[in-house]
Curated annotation (Swiss-Prot):
The gene is rpsE. PANTHER family: MITOCHONDRIAL RIBOSOMAL PROTEIN S5. This is Small ribosomal subunit protein uS5. NCBIfam families: rpsE_bact. Pfam families: Ribosomal_S5 (PF00333), Ribosomal_S5_C (PF03719). GO terms for molecular function: rRNA binding; structural constituent of ribosome.
């Protein structure tokens, strides 16, 4: 039993997951004796081949908060359908709280034109050519979640073709 657990952990580590911390913030809770300080970390994980997730961790120290954030992000991973030119398949908007993110596919060689947390999420998802704009809130957490929301709602060409009952070539035309 223990060997199986170890092998699953090794497989998890062998895969090419990268993690980036978007924000570390010191937060406080008012208790009877005064203020209790803790840290909140917003973490993005991705394998740069179409899987990405955002997580939040809170702990008494920074390392513990980041570890919890990575664990939370692994629970909220979404698959991103990418084209051959490493862009998204169609225009999409994402919303989380007061943040709204607009994304448009871009031609090869354009690069990732996005700012802040949105850029980090897109890079870890493996998107190489995209135009993105943050609207509304400037909160890194809400912008990251809005980006993941949009990426999770993307549909691949093959799924659309199957849904409509036509060949993929008809969709491209």
């Amino acid at each position: 039993m223990a060997k199986r657990r170890k092998s699953s952990k090794n497989k998890e580590k062998e895969t090419n997951w990268q993690e980036r911390v978007i924000q570390i913030r010191r937060v406080s809770k008012v208790v009877k004796g005064g203020k209790k300080l803790s840290f909140r970390a917003i973490v993005v994980i991705g394998n740069e081949t179409g899987k990405v997730g955002v997580g939040v961790g809170k702990a008494g120290d920074v390392i513990g908060a980041v570890r919890k954030g990575v664990s939370d992000a692994k629970k909220h991973v979404v698959d991103v359908p990418l084209t051959k030119t490493n862009t998204i398949t169609h225009r999409i908007n994402g919303v989380a709280g007061g943040a709204k993110v607009m994304m448009r596919p871009a031609a090869p060689g354009t690069g990732v034109i996005a700012g802040g947390a949105v850029r980090t999420v897109l890079e870890l998802a493996g998107v190489k050519n995209i135009l993105a704009k943050q609207l509304g809130s400037s909160s890194p957490l809400n912008n990251a979640r809005a980006t993941v929301d949009a990426l999770g709602n993307l549909r691949s060409f093959s799924s659309v073709a199957q849904e409509r009952g036509v060949s993929i070539e008809r969709i491209y035309a």
